[in-house]
Amino acid sequence: MFAVGGQSRPIEGTDGLSDDHPIIIPELSTNMFELYLSVAYGSWKPEGPTHNDIIDLLRFSNKFMSQKARDIAIHHLHEQRFRHKPYDLLALCLEFSITKFFVPAFQRLVEFRIRDIPGPMQKKLGFEVWNAFVDLKELLDEHRRIVACEEPPLIEHAACCTDNTACSIDWRQLWWNSMARFLLDGRNPQVFREAVNCFQELGSEIGRVNPECWKALLQTVKKGTAFHLAYDLVEETAQQLSAALITEPDQMLTRAELDAFSSN
């Protein structure tokens, strides 16, 4: 009774009367219609929907206001989010007004080097997102350099530390030669979590730093106090962008809700 794609239109007034005279829906591809049937009857091909299928579902939900199709598409994207580059997810969030994974995708994006992001993505992400990303990268790089150059203070030495001066000097040197190098490595700068993991593996290579002082200092470093401000700034920026750029569509009525509404 319905046909999709670019089929020739039936004689005016006869569309929908029989299988030979279907109602043409030119905006709906065959794949979209098959996906709609999968949504309606909860029956999917064994391998499940592909990424392109999910995009078609989102387009279908936008065009025909199908809340169920939208919910299923967003669920699949969220489940598979770590298989996709964060900039691809952000572009989808902006195109289809999805807030669910905008913030975590932006947080992942910040860990990318600018040169590793394909040029066309700048246009897809738009001026606001790209400009915020570049500005944030500059601020975070500056913050990283400050942290690398300023070791956490050794406020109080352990009672068993017999040479406080030597302990403090070697602590400062240890920080610069290890943690600073991990953070500022020109070829492979490490994020804070990775840098801390490498730092605590130094083991006995701590010079004249007293072992008990080292344990206390390591606990301070692992708390990540110096990086909390950076994390908070990234999250706050992502939330502001999401609120400013994305407006989720109004909740669409399901078939059951439409039937209930029409019967009243």
Q: Where are the language model's segments positioned?
A:
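BTB/POZ (also called T1 in voltage-gated K+ channels) oligomerization domain detector
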Residues: 1-47, 171, 183-264
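Post-BTB helical module
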Residues: 28-125, 229, 233, 239-241, ...
